[in-house]
Amino acid sequence: MSTSANRSTPSARTVFFISDGTGITAETFGHSVLTQFDLRFKQIRLPFIDTLDKAHDALRKINDAYELDGQRPIIFSTLVKANLSKVVRQSKGMHMDLIQTFVEPLEQELGVKSTHTIGRSHTSTDSEEYKNRIEAINFSLAHDDGQSNKNLAEADVILVGVSRSGKTPTSLFLAMQYGIKAANYPLIPDDFAREKLPGGLLEYKSKIFGLSIAPDRLAEIRNERLPGSKYAALANCRYEVNEAEKMMRREGIRWMSSTTKSIEEISATILQEIKSEHRTD
């Protein structure tokens, strides 16, 4: 009997990224730290916590997660206002305050007070970059999971792969960090039966990049969402992954496995492919 079949999978640790702005700074730092650990995390972003009411609401969500999980949530915070940070610190989570950890010691070292403008732009170049990122985020959200075929010509990359192979988080990471307009489309059994890519993608095949994943890991992830379903069954996961990889090879699509890769590593590979493509244009 397989020992892996009997081994219980530890529940994902809940992580909150809290900010009185977009939360991108807290999330970026948090991701960099969390990727050092070979564990699963349930990540929740709470942006624009800029009033006491919102801070107390965040406090309730953190404490609810503690009661539900039976373990302390981890909190990455860039709350600038002390009164808001004080409320969140009363939670039952482990609090990682980026302001207190980094900004306050630098204030002492430099002998000046910070402007307390985490995430704000200081130059016209920064403003343009911020605008590009927001546009990319909106594009990625509008084109998540095959929601829309509109304006695909604007996409920098189109990710394809079976459901839960990492397309959505990769798309959003590319948008938030690099201003990359990334659409993503699931490859589903109907596509395998037709032996064709989802409708509307053939015209943009040069923009497509595929993500695959080991079937056993895919089954684990899907069972967290729909335990005991055909969708999450290992046999079905093997079928979908095999068919998706066959399709990508048949269509000449570049692809990689996301099984052991962090979002940062996947994104770096895609960025390299995009830059290489632009150099050859």
UniProtKB/Swiss-Prot annotation:
The keyword tRNA processing does not apply. Pfam families: Kinase-PPPase. Keywords: Kinase, Nucleotide-binding, Serine/threonine-protein kinase, Transferase. It catalyses: [pyruvate, water dikinase] + ADP = [pyruvate, water dikinase]-phosphate + AMP + H(+); [pyruvate, water dikinase]-phosphate + phosphate + H(+) = [pyruvate, water dikinase] + diphosphate. GO terms for molecular function: ADP binding; ATP binding; phosphotransferase activity, phosphate group as acceptor; protein serine/threonine kinase activity. It is an enzyme of class 2 (transferase). NCBIfam families: PRK05339.1 (NF003742). This is Putative phosphoenolpyruvate synthase regulatory protein. It comes from Herminiimonas arsenicoxydans.
